């Protein structure tokens, strides 16, 4: 670290090496890479705020066993973070960045892999790069006198990849094949959360709502288009602490998701689901905790047809001392054998049942050291 004009300049260097060996029934694929990262950052501080500029540079050398040539990339990812305390109660944080990331996590493979009994994927055999531009703004408010706080967040992301996966769904198998053409995904997101503590009533109330918009390219069975889908979520939690031996907590949440008409579907495909849970903790005597919780979720499977899933659990715990404790739990008292969910995954609607083990009873003795 250095001091320039009264502000810190920090230099960092990271070196990383990774060797991959991927086995398949037909062949073995080996690949390796060296990653050199230089991370300079400069921060300017003043009363109530600061700004930080980061200028990381990555140099990647990638080799694979089936090709003599080596791949190498130089990637530059600048970012700027700004923080300002606007007033005693209000704080603002904003950032902009342009990130370039090489695909160092997934190993290369120059063939077709079998993922499960019917899904196959043609491997990515070259170094790919994802370029991400982003900007976000956050406002935070905190009043310690009225015990009220809120946070507002707005974010935008534009991600460009040098390849995309083309999918082929057939009666006997599913195949994913990479296509080396640039494709872009755009995301807008907004969120609001707030919390209020009513001291005299012993009630802690919190809530949040968020909205997101996504635009993503999909290629499926030789049909291609951009999907535009939306999601809206809201939740409220209330907790009462008026008694030391009884503490209830209620949570309610709801979701609405919809997808704009495209070549895959001519309707908005609106789906709704809701959830609520009630948790009750009892402390009748010192060191003993009894609890019970009930939850119920409602999923819209198709238009105006819903699946209702209800669960009830109960249990107790007794602390003998700071090291020893015993507990007993009963889960899934309604003895449900499965529950149903539905969702959209890109262009496809999924509706399935998740198997459960039914009612369970467990006793445990714990020792902490």
Where do the protein language model's features map onto the residues?
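Exposed, low-structure sequence patches enriched in small/polar residues
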Residues: 1-369
């Amino acid at each position: 670290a250095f001091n320039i004009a009264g502000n810190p300049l920090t230099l960092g260097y990271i070196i990383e090496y990774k060797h991959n060996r991927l086995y398949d029934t037909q062949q073995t694929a080996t690949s390796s890479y060296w990653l050199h990262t230089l991370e300079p950052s400069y921060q300017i501080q003043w009363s109530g705020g600061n700004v930080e500029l980061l200028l990381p540079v990555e140099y990647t050398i990638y080799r694979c066993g089936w090709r003599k040539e080596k791949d190498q990339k130089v990637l530059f990812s600048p970012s700027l973070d700004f923080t300002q305390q606007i007033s005693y109660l209000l704080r603002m944080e904003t950032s902009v960045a342009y990130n370039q990331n090489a695909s160092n996590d997934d190993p290369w493979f120059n063939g077709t892999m079998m993922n499960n009994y019917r899904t196959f994927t043609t491997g990515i055999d070259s170094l790919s790069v994802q370029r991400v531009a982003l900007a976000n703004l956050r406002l935070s408010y905190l009043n310690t006198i009225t015990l009220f706080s809120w946070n507002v967040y707005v974010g935008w992301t534009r991600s460009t990849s040098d390849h995309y996966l083309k999918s082929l769904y057939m009666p006997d198998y599913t195949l994913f094949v990479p296509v080396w053409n640039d494709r872009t995904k755009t995301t807008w997101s907004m969120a609001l959360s707030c919390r209020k503590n009513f001291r005299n009533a012993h009630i802690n109330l919190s809530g949040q709502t968020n909205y997101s918009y996504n635009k993503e390219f999909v290629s499926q069975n030789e049909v291609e288009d951009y999907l535009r889908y939306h999601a809206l979520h809201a939740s409220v939690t209330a907790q009462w602490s008026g008694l030391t031996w009884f503490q209830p907590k209620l949570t309610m949440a709801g979701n609405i998701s919809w997808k704009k008409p495209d070549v895959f579907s001519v309707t908005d495909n609106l789906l709704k689901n809701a959830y609520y849970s009630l948790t009750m903790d009892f402390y009748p005597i010192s060191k003993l905790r009894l609890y019970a919780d009930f939850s119920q979720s409602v999923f819209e499977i198709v238009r105006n047809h819903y699946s209702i899933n209800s669960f009830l659990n109960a249990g107790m715990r007794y602390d003998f001392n700071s090291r020893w404790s015993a507990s007993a739990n009963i889960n899934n008292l309604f003895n449900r054998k499965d529950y149903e969910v539905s969702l959209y995954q890109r262009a496809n609607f999924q509706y399935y049942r998740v198997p459960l083990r039914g009612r369970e009873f467990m006793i445990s003795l714990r020792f902490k050291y």
